[in-house]
């Protein structure tokens, strides 16, 4: 029944919500009044950026058990470079399962996405898509299914990219 609003946006827009709220039809970006119409007994909380950062740092420290290469992607992401850890943990699926188990044991929900490009992994996770893609050539086709908003790029950039048929190829080209 939890609905989180961003005080920086006047406290009138939902920025996150719990499972019960989602089941009732509440979604991030929705006006608070609309959310309350769907879930009148919602528990409305103000977003706390400091606590979010502390939680990300806690997750990052836990992730060091799996790899020494961990990066924070505030406000909601932690990226792990796991190529060197795969053999140690029995492969991709086993490693992802262990990371997920560790997070669940701490009461945290997660979306794990593993791709050859770190931003692509972040975008899949932000889009609620758990994927494991090891071949770079498979990436562009899968990226095309993602909403551009998952990139969190400026609105002007999103409008420009939306006019391009093959925007994923721009992201997946070798550097």
What is the predicted function of each stretch?
Residues 1-79, 84-86, 92-101, 110-118:
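Residues that scaffold, gate, or flank divalent-cation-dependent active/transport sites
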Residues 30, 47, 90, 134-135, ...:
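Short coil/turn linker and secondary-structure boundary residues
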Residues 91-146:
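Hydrophobic alpha-helical positions that pack around
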Residues 125-175:
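Compact, charge-rich alpha-helical regulatory domains located at protein termini
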Residues 65, 88, 123, 157-160:
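Intrinsic disorder/low-structure terminal segments
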Residues 67-71, 107, 111, 151-154, ...:
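Residue-level signal for secondary-structure boundary elements
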């Amino acid at each position: 029944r939890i609905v989180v609003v961003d005080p920086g946006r006047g406290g009138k827009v939902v920025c996150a919500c719990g499972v019960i709220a989602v089941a009732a039809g509440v979604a991030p970006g929705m006006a608070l009044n609309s959310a309350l119409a769907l879930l009148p007994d919602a528990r409305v909380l103000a977003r706390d950026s400091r606590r979010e950062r502390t939680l990300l740092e806690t997750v990052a420290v836990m992730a060091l058990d799996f790899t020494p290469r961990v990066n924070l992607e505030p406000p909601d992401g932690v990226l792990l470079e796991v190529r060197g850890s795969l053999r140690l943990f029995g492969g991709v699926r086993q490693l992802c399962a262990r990371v997920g188990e560790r997070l669940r044991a701490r009461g945290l929900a997660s979306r794990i996405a593993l791709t050859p490009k770190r931003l692509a992994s972040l975008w899949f996770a932000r889009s609620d898509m758990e994927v494991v893609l090891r071949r770079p050539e498979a990436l562009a086709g899968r990226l095309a299914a993602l909403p551009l908003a998952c990139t969190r790029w400026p609105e002007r950039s999103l409008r420009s990219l939306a006019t391009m048929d093959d925007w994923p190829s721009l992201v997946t080209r070798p550097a």
